């Protein structure tokens, strides 16, 4: 392991010490809590949408969340280990066969829906036993 990888690994450990990042994938509906500073006030803003892309690059990992806001599609890119992200919550798991869901940009309405990934009873029982 070279020096840069070692430093990045230590930085990731430092940034994730006070928060947990859940496992999520493209197709999942997530709520990203973002720290917003307005003047001297600091508040948390929730951004809910579908993850259409995830970029795994160590410390530079990022993901794109798409939502429909007043009839208009809005996409926002988040850095996974950014201090501006207060937390990430997975609302529902999506069942998709692609890593990048850029085709959702051309779709609207019912054709832009993503099927929910259903967990089998055996997997649910194993998870409950943990």
UniProtKB/Swiss-Prot annotation:
GO molecular function: structural constituent of ribosome
Signal peptide positions on this chain: none
Keyword field contains Zinc: no
A GO CC term attached to the entry: cytosolic large ribosomal subunit
Gene3D superfamilies: 2.30.30.790
Swiss-Prot/TrEMBL GO biological process terms: translation
SUPFAM superfamilies: Translation proteins SH3-like domain (SSF50104)
Covalent S-S links between cysteines: none
One Pfam entry name: Ribosomal_L19
UniProt keyword annotation of Secreted present: no
Keywords noted in UniProt: Ribonucleoprotein, Ribosomal protein
InterPro entries the UniProt entry points to: Ribosomal_bL19, Ribosomal_bL19_CS, Ribosomal_bL19_sf, Translation_prot_SH3-like_sf
Role according to the record: This protein is located at the 30S-50S ribosomal subunit interface and may play a role in the structure and function of the aminoacyl-tRNA binding site.
Family affiliation: Belongs to the bacterial ribosomal protein bL19 family.
NCBIfam families from the UniProt entry: rplS_bact
Name this polypeptide is given: Large ribosomal subunit protein bL19
Upper taxonomic lineage: Bacteria, Pseudomonadati, Pseudomonadota, Betaproteobacteria, Burkholderiales
Gene: rplS
């Amino acid at each position: 392991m070279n020096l840069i990888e070692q430093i990045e690994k230590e930085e990731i450990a430092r940034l994730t010490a006070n928060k947990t990042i859940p496992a999520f994938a493209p197709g999942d509906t997530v709520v990203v809590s973002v720290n917003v500073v307005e003047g001297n006030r600091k508040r948390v803003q929730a951004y809910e949408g579908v993850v259409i892309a995830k970029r795994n690059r160590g410390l530079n990992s990022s993901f794109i969340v798409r939502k429909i806001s007043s009839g208009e599609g809005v996409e926002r890119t988040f850095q996974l280990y950014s201090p501006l992200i207060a937390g990430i919550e997975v609302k529902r798991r999506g069942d998709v066969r692609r890593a990048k869901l850029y085709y959702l940009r051309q779709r609207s309405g019912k054709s832009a829906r993503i099927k929910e990934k259903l967990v089998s009873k055996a997997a649910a029982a194993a998870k409950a036993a943990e």
